[in-house]
């Protein structure tokens, strides 16, 4: 053994060839600060070996290196800029020394090589991969950019266009694509990986492969003519500006850095990467996006822990076909759980099957599946008008009309047709689960399972625990949601649960602004362009359905009359009374017509102005700051109340539910991350300016206490150790 660290070791293989093996405790390898330091020590040992002829890098895990240790990021990003820059210089010196070894090097890459893992293998001369490879640089999705030389080496290896596509979008690619663009030199079966890598290494040692020529371009300026460079970088900057926008500075910074570094050799190019990385790491956007990643890991880990002792349902059923039922059936079947889809008429069943078939055909058109796979999936969806086969199902989700009487009747009837241990769930969006449970003989086997539309795209499923829902029931439903590829978050029961409970105060803020004379177009523009929502409240209401919102608004008002009961006729009432239900009937705040792709396109409609004039004061202008405050304060206050009342368990789960269920702007990180970034005292000052608008603007006492003591909702993060300590971690 030449060297042994906590996460990697170095040993001789044969005749002057050494292997450097990443083998961290646990299931995966991460390129954390300790591993970077250890890698530097191992390379120091190699540099002393006069008889070294070649080096093989490999992993003892199912994945090569999944990336940097993102749990370190928040503390690392609190280090002063100068110290962070010094540590990056140290880390890059390690990878430079790996690249500069006086012998050929190869990485045998299996599974994931992402972020720092990808940057590590870019420093070797050759890369041989297995078919399960996923390799790329996802840093821009975390609000940063590659910091271990990825923005320098990748463009010089692949050419500017391919590298920009991966780096700016934070993409990873599979084995075939990696081979095609030159990111790896070959792909072999897993059992042949080491044998194949050794064969390449021997050829390089023997002079049959020119490893020095392979290495040279990575250390020189990027080979691009002035015209080629202008075209590549101009197009890339335009595309990034269009897709990422001003709220995500990392992608455009990465492109500009690669452009600026193109004319320099390795050392100066790495300095430019360092100078760009450090300021990004100190942005609120980076902290928010890293926070989302960590919250996502927390939520998924919690679901995994919750379901460790239960079996994933093997057969499911959906009550109520149509678009929602068909979407749920498709998602279950697509992920391998056969499903019975029941309705009371053929027309709805046809609609449900058509929806599932449409989604599968899209996969076929994109080349994701072939005809055989399509037929196989669709054959596991069984439409029926009766309860045939319900005695074999493990779980049933009800997705009928949002009416408590209808839901109770359907659930009670279904309970008599299934086994004693079958779990029942309701896809209600607002009706309290404990109320629906009153119709059942076995309420302990019942809970809520709130999907979001469109089911195949929206990652969140709210799992609602009723008063009598058993732990086993919750675990089984969480297991099914996870199997379906969703992110399940368990919440306690109340009208609207979590997501809709906090959404409708936001809509109430919108209605009050309209009442006071604001223009709905300006509100949408401000909330989209300035705050960052994917769609403004008027457009969102049109997509959700004005009729759906009108009904849900009444349910919420009955559930929380002290805050959500209004004493005036609002814009939603006016549009509902005029049969303007949004996209579903082509008339809402806008008029909708199908575009060339069959998608609804919004157009101005003068008729809506007359309707809104009936429920609004004369038009007046509002500042962007006031619009944002009046929209967001009611929502954030309600989010805080949900935490204080135990409806949602943690700030992390609340923020993920908002991001995954409502599209809360990721660069804000969620309501609690936004609160912490803004500061609770500053938020309180802002909210108090609008408390005259009513109870929705009254800040909960718990948040007032936070403001008094200057306490954040997320645990405070301590800066990482001084840079000198990190080098020897």
UniProtKB/Swiss-Prot annotation:
Protein name: Fatty acid oxidation complex subunit alpha
GO-annotated molecular function: 3-hydroxybutyryl-CoA epimerase activity; delta(3)-delta(2)-enoyl-CoA isomerase activity; enoyl-CoA hydratase activity; long-chain-3-hydroxyacyl-CoA dehydrogenase activity; NAD+ binding
Keyword Cytoplasm listed: no
Pathway given in the UniProt record: Lipid metabolism; fatty acid beta-oxidation
Family designation: In the N-terminal section; belongs to the enoyl-CoA hydratase/isomerase family.
Segments crossing the lipid bilayer: none
Job of this protein: Involved in the aerobic and anaerobic degradation of long-chain fatty acids via beta-oxidation cycle. Catalyzes the formation of 3-oxoacyl-CoA from enoyl-CoA via L-3-hydroxyacyl-CoA. It can also use D-3-hydroxyacyl-CoA and cis-3-enoyl-CoA as substrate.
Annotated catalytic residues: 450 (for 3-hydroxyacyl-coa dehydrogenase activity)
Keyword annotations from UniProtKB, A to Z: Fatty acid metabolism, Isomerase, Lipid degradation, Lipid metabolism, Lyase, Multifunctional enzyme, NAD, Oxidoreductase
Reaction(s) catalysed by this chain's protein: a (3S)-3-hydroxyacyl-CoA + NAD(+) = a 3-oxoacyl-CoA + NADH + H(+); a (3S)-3-hydroxyacyl-CoA = a (2E)-enoyl-CoA + H2O; a 4-saturated-(3S)-3-hydroxyacyl-CoA = a (3E)-enoyl-CoA + H2O; (3S)-3-hydroxybutanoyl-CoA = (3R)-3-hydroxybutanoyl-CoA
Gene from which the chain derives: fadB
Region (3-hydroxyacyl-CoA dehydrogenase), start-end ranges: 311-729
Region span, Disordered: 708-729
Region (Enoyl-CoA hydratase/isomerase): 1-189
Example of a GO cellular component annotation carried by this entry: fatty acid beta-oxidation multienzyme complex
Site feature: Important for catalytic activity: 119, 139
């Amino acid at each position: 053994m030449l060297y042994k660290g906590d996460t990697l070791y170095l040993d001789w293989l044969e005749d002057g060839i050494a292997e450097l093996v990443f083998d961290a405790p646990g299931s995966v390898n991460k390129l954390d600060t300790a591993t970077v330091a250890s890698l530097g020590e191992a390379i120091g040992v190699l540099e002393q070996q006069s008889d070294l002829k070649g080096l093989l890098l490999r992993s003892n895990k199912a994945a090569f290196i999944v990336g940097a240790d993102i749990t370190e990021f928040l503390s690392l990003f609190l280090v002063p800029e100068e110290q962070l820059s010094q540590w990056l210089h140290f880390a890059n010196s390690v990878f430079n020394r790996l690249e500069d070894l006086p012998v050929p090097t190869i990485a045998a890459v299996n599974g994931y090589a992402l972020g720092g893992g990808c940057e590590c293998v870019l420093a070797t001369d050759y890369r041989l991969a297995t078919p399960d490879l996923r390799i790329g640089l996802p840093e821009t999705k975390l609000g940063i950019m590659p910091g271990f030389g990825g923005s320098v080496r990748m463009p010089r290896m692949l050419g500017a266009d391919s590298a920009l596509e991966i780096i700016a979008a934070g993409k990873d690619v599979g084995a075939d694509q990696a081979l095609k663009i030159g990111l790896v030199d070959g792909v072999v079966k897993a059992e042949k990986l080491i044998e194949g890598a050794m064969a390449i290494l021997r050829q390089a040692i023997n002079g049959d492969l020119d490893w020095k020529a392979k290495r040279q371009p990575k250390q020189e300026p990027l080979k691009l003519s002035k015209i080629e460079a202008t075209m590549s970088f101009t197009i890339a900057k335009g595309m990034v500006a269009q897709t990422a926008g001003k709220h995500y500075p990392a992608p455009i910074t990465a492109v500009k850095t690669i452009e600026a570094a193109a004319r320099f050799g390795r050392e100066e190019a790495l300095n430019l990467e360092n100078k760009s990385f450090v300021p990004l790491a100190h942005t609120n956007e980076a902290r928010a996006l890293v926070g989302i990643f960590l919250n996502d890991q927390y939520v998924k880990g919690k679901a995994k822990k919750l379901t460790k002792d239960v079996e994933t349902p093997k057969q499911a059923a959906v009550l109520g076909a149509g678009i929602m039922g068909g979407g749920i059936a498709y998602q279950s079947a697509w992920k391998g759980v056969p499903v019975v889809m029941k309705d009371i008429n053929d027309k709805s069943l046809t609609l449900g099957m058509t929806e599932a078939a449409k989604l599968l055909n899209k996969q076929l058109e994109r080349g994701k599946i072939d005809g055989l796979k399509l037929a196989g999936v669709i054959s596991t969806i069984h439409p029926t008008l009766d309860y045939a086969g319900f005695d074999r199902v493990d779980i049933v989700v009800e997705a009928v009309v949002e009416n408590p009487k209808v839901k109770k009747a359907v659930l009670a009837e279904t309970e008599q047709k299934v086994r004693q241990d079958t779990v029942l769930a309701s896809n209600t969006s607002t009706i309290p689960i404990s109320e629906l449970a009153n119709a059942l003989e076995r309420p302990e086997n019942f809970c809520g399972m709130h999907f979001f539309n469109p089911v195949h795209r929206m990652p969140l499923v709210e799992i609602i625990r009723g008063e009598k829902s058993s732990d086993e029931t919750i675990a089984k439903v969480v297991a099914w949601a996870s199997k379906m590829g969703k992110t399940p978050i368990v919440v306690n029961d109340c009208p609207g649960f979590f997501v809709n409970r906090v959404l409708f105060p936001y809509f109430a803020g919108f209605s009050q602004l309209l009442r006071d004379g604001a223009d709905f177009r300006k509100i949408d523009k401000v909330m989209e362009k300035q705050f960052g929502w994917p769609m403004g409240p008027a457009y969102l209401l049109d997509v959700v359905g004005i009729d759906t919102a009108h009904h849900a608004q009444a349910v919420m008002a009955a559930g929380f009359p002290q805050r959500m009961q209004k004493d005036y006729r609002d814009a939603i009432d006016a549009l509902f009374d005029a049969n303007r239900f949004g996209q579903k009937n082509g008339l809402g705040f806008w008029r909708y017509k199908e575009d060339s792709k069959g998608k609804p396109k919004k157009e101005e409609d003068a008729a809506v102005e007359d309707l809104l004039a009936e429920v609004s004061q004369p038009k007046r202008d509002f500042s962007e700051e006031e619009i944002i405050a009046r929209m967001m304060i009611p929502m954030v206050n309600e989010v805080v109340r949900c935490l204080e009342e135990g409806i949602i368990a943690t700030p992390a789960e609340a923020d993920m539910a908002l991001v995954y269920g409502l599209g809360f702007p990721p660069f804000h990180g969620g309501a609690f991350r936004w609160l912490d970034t803004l500061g609770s005292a500053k938020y309180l000052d802002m909210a108090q300016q609008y408390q005259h608008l009513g109870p929705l603007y009254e800040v909960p006492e718990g948040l007032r206490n936070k403001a008094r003591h200057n306490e954040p909702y997320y645990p405070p993060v301590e800066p990482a150790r001084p840079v000198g300590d990190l080098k020897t971690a």
